[in-house]
């Protein structure tokens, strides 16, 4: 399936846009924490112009649904909804944590990734993912927001070496050093739309899209317990 998907993400300090067309990705990104509203629409125009497409030519519009900065997540979904509504496109929300796992695979071939984004207030947004042979990512832990010291206390021992991604690892290096499994740094700090668009294609192929009015953010602030998902090794 040769899908044409535009992805937008402003959930963290990184502002990014990516366009998937003919299985090729055209992307723009810039770490600009306070300029997302200024940067994102020009990026959209650039990638569409480079591909010779308009919004009406696309099959879907994807967005980083969170977790991340409350303001950043709201900006991204608001802009994505506006574009999708005008072009009558279905939408696909993609986890920013899962996108960082995909980035670790893209850059380093990592297949077991532990993602921790600095959530401020002495907490991290946390999840672990394992990549399957079909390219899909399976969550090992339920996405949550949790104090890193508590995470280190509650996490179960594991024989795998987990590739780390996210700003939480440097922000809470001492606390997370207590985790009962080995880690290797991927140097992936932020989610990026070029990875969101790949995960969005998987969802599109499964028919997992929603209309504009049903697209929603994921903040995680009400999900504060670490939980290993059932049946996941």
Swiss-Prot record:
It comes from the Bacteria. This is tRNA threonylcarbamoyladenosine biosynthesis protein TsaB. Pfam families: TsaD. It is found in: Cytoplasm. Homodimer. GO terms for biological process: tRNA threonylcarbamoyladenosine modification. Keywords: Cytoplasm, tRNA processing. GO terms for cellular component: cytosol. Its main location: cytoplasm. The lineage of its organism: Bacteria, Pseudomonadati, Pseudomonadota, Gammaproteobacteria, Vibrionales. InterPro entries: ATPase_NBD, Gcp-like_dom, T6A_TsaB. It comes from Vibrio parahaemolyticus serotype O3:K6 (strain RIMD 2210633). Belongs to the KAE1 / TsaD family. TsaB subfamily. Structural analysis identified two distinctly different modes of TsaB dimer formation. In one form, prevalent in the absence of nucleotide, the putative nucleotide-binding site is incomplete and lacks a binding pocket for a nucleotide base. In the second form, an interface between the two subunits apparently completes a nucleotide-binding site. This analysis suggests that the two dimer architectures observed in the crystal structures correspond to a free and a nucleotide-bound form of TsaB. Required for the formation of a threonylcarbamoyl group on adenosine at position 37 (t(6)A37) in tRNAs that read codons beginning with adenine. Is involved in the transfer of the threonylcarbamoyl moiety of threonylcarbamoyl-AMP (TC-AMP) to the N6 group of A37, together with TsaD and TsaE; this reaction does not require ATP in vitro. TsaB seems to play an indirect role in the t(6)A biosynthesis pathway, possibly in regulating the core enzymatic function of TsaD.
